[in-house]
Amino acid sequence: IHGLAEGDRIFVEHYVGCMHCEWCRAGEYRHCELTDWRTNPDGRRYGYTSSDNPGRLWGGFSQYMYLPWNAVTHKVPDGVTAELAGLVTPLSNGIEWALNAGRVGYAKTVLIQGPGQQGLSQVVASKQAGASLIVVTGTTRDASRLQLASDLGADAVVDVLEEDALARVLELTGGKGVDVVLDCTSGAGTAPVLLGIDALKRREGVMVTQGEEAAFPDFPLKKMTEKCITLASARGHSYRSVELALEQLASHRFPLERLATHSFGLEDVDHAIRALAGETGEDALHISLKPWGDR
């Protein structure tokens, strides 16, 4: 691959673009038809492509990976450990969703729903962008993650099972509501979206939401229209966001190493997956899989 040499430490994006369409030329490989497995049954993407396909090694659960000529790679800066480099995907998503999709910037007020990898990454992105107020919501079982959100720069955290989240947001904003809502809840149903719509300012608020498998009957379009809310979707990241994530990790400005809560060897990959899925009671926030052990 052009620009790489043996011994380079690299981060490989999961997109495998064609490199000549309008999206690839703009560094938006996520939108390339060649790598979109949803619409292209022959699409290639690391972590999604079966080992039955040519190249075989299309994932990270191995000691080697197959890199075709069109693999999208980034050099990892010196001083960024393998565990930190493993945070590039959630952090680049956080940068993409908060700054580009959500338009978070100087003096903006932000509500982030869900203190997982993506939510905490958006705390960092919003803080770095100059947001004047960052509120993070979660549940009682998220107590340690809400504390981490505070340590990363959130101005207030709310346990939605113990407090009236909307009332708290309005209290913190003098009754105005926030400029931006970033919904990072997964499998929480429609309640977070409804809360986000109510918590936004009356005019020109922005809500960024994810939920590829979610359905929303009776969506409150009338309320969105009345409040002039812009709804944006969260999906993946651009090349530029990955570069910014690597720069952020190299700066060591935030204690991002605290997101890398667990580490396992290749022989424990099944346990690692179950731990991340919440099946083992370990509260794994982000897991590092080390195919070569501690080498």
Predicted regions and their residues:
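Glycine-rich beta-strand-centered segment in the early N-terminal region that forms part
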Residues: 1-25, 29-30, 77-79
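Iron-sulfur (Fe-S) cluster-binding segments and ferredoxin-like electron-carrier domains
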Residues: 25-44
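Mid-domain Rossmann-like dinucleotide-binding core that forms the NAD(H)/NADP(H) cofactor-binding site
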Residues: 63, 71-72, 77-163
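Glycine-rich cofactor phosphate-binding loops and adjacent beta1-alpha1 units
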Residues: 101-106, 128-129, 135, 143-147, ...
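C-terminal hydrophobic helical "lid"/dimerization subdomain
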Residues: 162-164, 171, 175-176, 191-198, ...
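Rossmann-fold dehydrogenase core element
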Residues: 205-208, 219-259
